[in-house]
Amino acid sequence: MQLRLLTAALLLSSTALYAQTVEVSKAWVRATVPGQQATGAFMHITSRNGGKLVGVSSPAAGVMEVHQMKMEGDVMKMRAAPVLDLPAGQTVQLKPGGYHVMMMDLKQPMEKGSHVPLTLHLQDAKGLDSTLELSVPVRTLAPSATASPADAQSGHGAHKH
């Protein structure tokens, strides 16, 4: 019995360690206008050891998907990306016109100055899953290059594993 408890504790601590090797910065959600049912969330994600973003969830939206926008000829196309690779030591930018998180079936308007809870669902190179809880500010535009680190930081709330 003690061996099973120890094994479970080690497994939980290993997923906690993975989530701690993922850093999120410059996160923001685009504000909406009345009646708008979808918006985007944007951020920079850096994984020290590599892994994958396998999903995103939030109580603020009924559907959350990672999407990629890409030019095909002279037409901009948007497609769902079920998994987003997070190469070791590299920063992956989720930004307007590229990879981003689509928030659809919004439960309420996204008002400038408010914060939205987001949960990143991550997977390490060994296939272990973890989550990273964020509180993301709502803005009308992308954060400026001169924004203070506190303005650009999304926060790393409590991790749930």
Task: Locate each region found by the language model.
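Bacterial N-terminal signal peptides that target proteins for export
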Residues: M1-T7
